[in-house]
Swiss-Prot record:
It catalyses: cytidine(1402) in 16S rRNA + S-adenosyl-L-methionine = N(4)-methylcytidine(1402) in 16S rRNA + S-adenosyl-L-homocysteine + H(+). Specifically methylates the N4 position of cytidine in position 1402 (C1402) of 16S rRNA. It is found in: Cytoplasm. This is Ribosomal RNA small subunit methyltransferase H. It is an enzyme of class 2 (transferase). Its main location: cytoplasm. One of its GO terms (molecular function) is rRNA (cytosine-N4-)-methyltransferase activity. GO terms for cellular component: cytoplasm. The gene is rsmH. Its EC number is 2.1.1.199. S-adenosyl-L-methionine binds at residues 41-43, 61, 85, 102, 109. Belongs to the methyltransferase superfamily. RsmH family. It comes from the Bacteria. Coiled coil: none annotated.
Length: 311
C-alpha cells in the first residue's frame, strides 16, 4: 500500500463544494451528510469542521488506500463504508441532508506507479479503484477481442484511432504476449495514433477509456444519481464535481430530466409527475485555483436541490 502521507492530493473546489452542499458558509444544519467519494478526505474534513454535535457524516470509497486514510479520522460523527457510491441505494429513504460526489481519480492514485493509472510512470497495467476485487486492465486486454477493445476505447475515450489501437494491442498479444505494464501500452498507442493533439499525450484517451471501463465508472455514477433521489430528504442538496465531458453530460442530463414535470403520453389527462430536483448552480474553479492546481482545470460542479414534492 502506498504511503498516502507522501502522495499529496489537493482537493478541487473545496470551499465551493462544501458551501454549495451545506447551503451557505455557516455551520451545517443538523442531519446526515454524505461524502460519496471520500478520496483522501479533503471534503469530509471540511464538512466535519462545519458540522454540529448532532450531525453525522457518512463516506463511501472502494479504494483500500482511501479506507486506510479515513482511519486517521477519529471523529465519532464520521463513518466510512468500503464500497462504491452506487451503494447509496442501501441508505434509508429521505435520510440525507446532502450528498457530495467528487468524481475521477485522486492525485495519489495517479501518481502511484503501482496503481497503473498513468502513462507517466512505469508500473503494472492495473487501474482498478478497488485492488481487492475484479480484473485488471492487463487481464482484460489479454482476452478481449479487437472489436471489444475498439468499442471501449471509442466509447469511453472518444478516441478516433480506437480501431488501429485495438488492432495494435491484438497484434502485440499474438506476437509477444499480453501487455503487462503502463509503459508498454503507452508506447504501443503512440505508434498507432497518427496525428497528435497539442499538449496531450497520445495515450491520454486510451488510458481514460480503459480506466472508466474496468471500474464501470459511468454505470456507477448513473446508479448513484438515481439512488440520490430516493435518499435525499426534501430540501437536501446534491453537488457533483466531474472532470471530463462523459461524466458531466450524465450529471447535466440527469438534473435536467428531473428538473421538469413529466407527462405520460399514454395518459394525456393524468396529472404530470412532479419535478424532483431544482437545478441551482454550475461552478468552475477560478483562475487562482487552476494556477495552483492545474488538474482542476477541467472540473465542473453542478448543484441541485431535492424538491419538497414527494417522489
Amino acid at each position: 500500500m502506498a504511503d498516502t502521507t507522501t502522495l499529496l492530493h489537493t482537493t478541487v473546489l473545496l470551499d465551493e463544494a462544501v458551501d454549495a452542499l451545506l447551503g451557505g458558509a455557516g455551520p451545517a444544519p443538523a442531519g446526515v451528510w454524505i461524502d460519496a467519494t471520500f478520496g483522501r478526505g479533503g471534503h469530509s474534513r471540511r464538512i466535519l469542521e462545519r458540522l454540529g454535535p448532532d450531525g453525522r457524516l457518512v463516506a463511501f470509497d472502494k479504494d483500500p488506500e482511501a479506507i486506510h486514510e479515513a482511519a486517521r479520522i477519529t471523529d465519532a460523527r464520521f463513518s466510512i463504508r468500503h464500497e462504491g457510491f452506487r451503494h447509496l441505494a442501501d441508505l434509508p429513504e429521505r435520510s440525507a441532508a446532502g450528498i457530495l460526489m467528487d468524481l475521477g481519480v485522486s492525485s495519489p492514485q495517479i501518481d502511484s506507479p503501482e496503481r497503473g493509472f498513468s502513462f507517466r510512470f512505469d508500473g503494472p497495467l492495473d487501474m482498478r479503484m478497488d485492488t481487492t476485487r475484479g480484473e485488471s486492465v492487463a487481464d482484460w486486454l489479454a482476452t478481449a477481442d479487437v472489436g471489444q477493445i475498439a468499442e471501449v476505447i471509442r466509447e469511453y475515450g472518444e478516441e478516433r484511432f480506437a480501431g488501429p489501437i485495438a488492432k495494435a494491442i491484438a497484434a502485440r498479444r499474438a506476437e509477444r504476449g499480453p501487455l503487462r505494464t503502463t509503459s508498454e501500452l503507452a508506447q504501443l498507442v503512440a505508434g498507432a495514433v497518427k496525428t497528435r493533439e497539442a499538449g496531450q499525450n497520445p495515450a491520454t484517451r486510451t488510458f481514460q477509456a480503459l480506466r472508466i471501463f474496468i471500474n464501470a465508472e459511468l454505470e456507477e455514477l448513473q446508479a448513484a444519481l438515481e439512488a440520490s433521489l430516493r435518499v435525499l430528504a426534501p430540501g437536501g442538496r446534491l453537488a457533483v464535481i466531474s472532470f471530463h465531458s462523459l461524466e458531466d453530460r450524465i450529471v447535466k442530463q440527469f438534473i435536467a430530466q428531473h428538473s421538469r414535470e413529466v407527462y405520460d403520453r399514454r395518459a394525456p389527462f393524468a396529472a404530470p409527475q412532479p419535478m424532483r430536483l431544482k437545478a441551482l448552480d454550475r461552478i468552475k474553479p477560478g483562475a487562482c485555483e487552476v494556477d495552483a492546481n492545474p488538474r482542476a482545470r477541467s472540473a465542473v460542479m453542478r448543484v441541485a436541490e431535492r424538491t419538497e414534492v414527494p417522489a
